Every structure is written in C-alpha cells, then in structure tokens.
Amino acid sequence: MGRFIFVSFGLLVVFLSLSGTAADCPSGWSSYDGHCYQVFSDLKNWDDAESFCSGQHEGSRLASIHSREEEAFVGKMASRTLKYTSMWLGLNNPWKECKWEWSDDTRLDYKVWTRRPYCTVMVVKTDRIFWFNRGCEKSVSFVCKFKAYSEDAAE
C-alpha cells in the first residue's frame, strides 16, 4: 500500500511539472518566464479583448512578446487551443502616428511585422509565425498575459 502511494505521488509530481501550469498561475493559465498566459477563442475586437484581459487578473493585458522563444511558446499554446490561429497581441498604434506600443507599457524590443495598419495579430501556421497588422475593429481570438505571482513579492 505504501509503495502504491509513493508511486502515485511520484506520477502526480511528474504530471504537474509537465503540464505547463505553474503553481503561481491560476488554473487554466500557462506559465512561461515569470508570466501567466491564456489563449481565448472568443472573437473580440482589439479594445474589447484588451478590456476582457484587464478583467481576468490584476495586471493582465493583451500579451506582449519580447523574444522568439516567448513567441514560440504562445504559438504552441494557440495551435493547441484555436481552430484558426490568428489572435490579437497587445501591440497597437493608438494615435495612428507610427508610434507602436504594447498595451502593458513594456518596451517594444521584439517585432516581426509583415504589414502595417493599427493593431497586431499573430498568425500561427504549421511551421511559421507571422505578425500582421489589422484594423482594430476586426474580431479575432486573443491571448492575455500577466506577471506571475511570486512568494518573494508577497514578503
């Protein structure tokens, strides 16, 4: 009996470590590099998606992407969740003055554009990821992101 409990506990630990959801992210959210992410299949325009993300968790916004690795992580999540892998990111050009910015106020240090209107969608194909600019009024899926809770931050 003790051996069964030990083996069961070991399998549970392995399952939880491979599930992609860290203890510091809420259920249903995936963890990457200190942030929590969730892809939503609901179709919303950019403003409604941003508002929805803001209501999900303190500090949650449409996702900002800062590296190829982060982009690949979000792309993999999207391809598992969405039928059509086109989703809003937090990157927009709110005043239409060619001053692009992330909705979470992080620095624009990584970008992979293909075209140029006012809000940005990430499209995941089988072997490639593209960013397209699309009119903010279009309705597509979206991905939200927030900084993961840290035990150290609570002290």
From Swiss-Prot:
Record's miscellaneous remark: Shows greater sequence similarity to the beta than alpha subunits compared to other heterodimer snaclecs.
SUPFAM superfamilies in the record: C-type lectin-like
Name of the protein: Snaclec clone 2100755
Domain C-type lectin intervals: 32-145
GO CC terms of this entry: extracellular region
Plastid keyword on record: no
Cited function: Interferes with one step of hemostasis (modulation of platelet aggregation, or coagulation cascade, for example).
Record's keyword annotation contains Disulfide bond: yes
PANTHER family for this protein: MANNOSE, PHOSPHOLIPASE, LECTIN RECEPTOR RELATED
Pfam families per the UniProt record, alphabetical: Lectin_C
Record organism: Deinagkistrodon acutus
Main location (coarse class): secreted
Keyword terms: Disulfide bond, Hemostasis impairing toxin, Secreted, Signal, Toxin
Record-linked Gene3D superfamilies: Mannose-Binding Protein A, subunit A (3.10.100.10)
InterPro entries: C-type_lectin-like, C-type_lectin-like/link_sf, C-type_lectin/snaclec_domain, C-type_lectin_CS, CTDL_fold
